[in-house]
């Protein structure tokens, strides 16, 4: 296990400590990410293509037409041979050998968790997703893992589409700090430290939309604080963001929200 921050950044060792010394409590959660694959090594003839949608619906009828090119994804399945390799490597998985004991997102299980929780399932679906228009890097959704790189590669090579697999980066697990969100106001300002706002994963949530929604509210209220205006709070009856934030600050979390 290695200490680290965001991609290609060092760990922020003392950031949590600088906040908890003011009485704010912190805990740990975990998440994971899958292997990144070189598209030039994939046998797409052994996969099923999934075309992107071109029928776009927006909230406004006067929006500009969407110009972003849609890219296709592909699907395939694991098999018993790949499961056997994964099972044999479980003792080297931090998620199963005791190195990582935090709670992770319920609906994004690792491939290790899938084969342990559902031993009767002969296969699990995988989604191969492009990382962008101008890269050969593909994201293998459904194969989040903390197993050693050689085990991940060996298991994937048992799948026909990946028999000549070349990867950019293996999957890995992450354990991170978060702060109990009941210590926040509905504006996402901390109760203990005036003018300190928190948004996203640090509040115990998981997901891009959840983080983005909190960021909007925290940013608006930080601006309002600077200019002495009235707090901006969305109610449960007004927006999904209102439901999200009310859940966080009144109920707290015991797993990634």
Predicted regions and their residues:
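An anion/pyrophosphate-binding glycine-rich loop and adjacent beta-alpha core
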Residues: 17-153, 241, 250-257
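Flexible, glycine/charged-enriched surface loops at secondary-structure junctions
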Residues: 29, 96-104, 162-170, 229-234
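A glycine-rich dinucleotide-binding beta-alpha-beta segment and adjacent secondary-structure elements
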Residues: 139-205, 232-246
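Glycine-rich loop(s) and the adjacent beta-strand/alpha-helix scaffold that form part
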Residues: 1-38, 159-160, 164, 217-230
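Conserved mid-domain beta->alpha element of the FAD-binding
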Residues: 195-224
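Short, conserved loop/turn and helix-capping segments at secondary-structure boundaries
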Residues: 5-13, 145, 212-213, 234-238
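Non-catalytic terminal regions with compositionally biased, polar/charged low complexity
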Residues: 216, 222, 228-257
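Acidic helix/loop or adjacent segment enriched in Glu/Asp that either coordinates divalent metal
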Residues: 19, 210-214, 247
